[in-house]
Amino acid sequence: MAPHFTVIRDITPDSAIPRGAVVAMGNFDGVHLGHRAVIAAALEMGRAQGRPALALTFEPHPRRFFSPNTPQFRLTDERAKLRLLAGTGLAGAVVMTFDKARAGTTAQDFIHHDLIGRLGIGGIAVGYDFHFGKGRVGSPSLLVNEAPRLGIEVDVQPHVDIDERPVSSSAIRIALAEGQIDEATTMLGAPWFITGEVIHGEKRGRDLGYPTANIRLDANCGLKHGIYAVRVGRGSERLDGVASFGRRQTFDNGAPLLEIFLFDFKGDLYGQALDCAFIGFIREELKFDGLEALIRQMDDDSARARVLLAAAPDAFPKLGTVD
């Protein structure tokens, strides 16, 4: 049985925070390989010191606070991020609310009041480019310089490169927007996934022999419209399928929707929350002259999806349980 993952929202006098813990600090959007290097450093530091290791992260994402009217494509919402963090071996996460007060806290106050005073950290791991505090004055070098006086260990992780390019959340967003699923998967260390509740549709897919589980995604989802090979998680069960994301051009040019056809599955999924991992990009959206042409293409899409999925039989993100 996996150890319990504790989530602490903000820090109050009543918070059950294990003082002296080692923290991995960051926004962790996507929990990609660069983030995982920071987490691994915190876990190793914790083992060496005999201390638990926690994530320290912020919600909403600071970009959302500073630019509330700018569309933000997040790789992971708060719950998805926490589920990924729970799968890394960390003991828990402290989620700090990023609001006006937090944005106005100086880096020195954050270090002394929050990290040392409230959390009493024994060590901290950060990425090379992580900044914090008012005006983003707080930096890895500031933590390193303060460490001897504070009596804590600081680990600064360099960037992780793939094909001589640094891994970043921005690079992953670009890859997803271009339908480069393999590239995004490599940078993430696992397939990108979304979670959503199955809603009722117009049941046109059923009439075509392809009944779908329909999920509305965030309006700011930047995934390229098209057809994908997907693997769906329903609890511990894994179901393979093919999915269409975008506007249903053949019918009504409606709002973007994820429509998933699951192979070899019969059952009612309405109202259930599914995790959908994107394994491969098959093609862009097309508009068909008639239903026969559409069905032939759907048959071909399904065959191609089965090949992609068979080549990656274990591809799925490692997710922990979050209360």
Identify the function of each model-found stretch.
Residues 1-22:
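Positively charged, low-complexity intrinsically disordered leader regions
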Residues 64-128, 132-150:
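N-terminal Rossmann-like or analogous alpha/beta NTP/dinucleotide-binding catalytic cores
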Residues 32, 85, 124, 184, ...:
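Residue-level signal for inorganic ion chemistry
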Residues 139, 144-246, 322-323:
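Glycine-rich, Lys/Arg-enriched anion-binding loops that position phosphate/diphosphate groups
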Residues 201-323:
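Phosphate/ribose-recognition catalytic cores of enzymes acting on nucleotide-derived substrates
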Residues 58, 98, 159:
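Cofactor-binding loop segments of dinucleotide-utilizing enzymes, especially the Rossmann-like FAD-
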Residues 18-25, 33-92:
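Active-site rim/loop-helix segments in enzyme catalytic domains that contact anionic ligands
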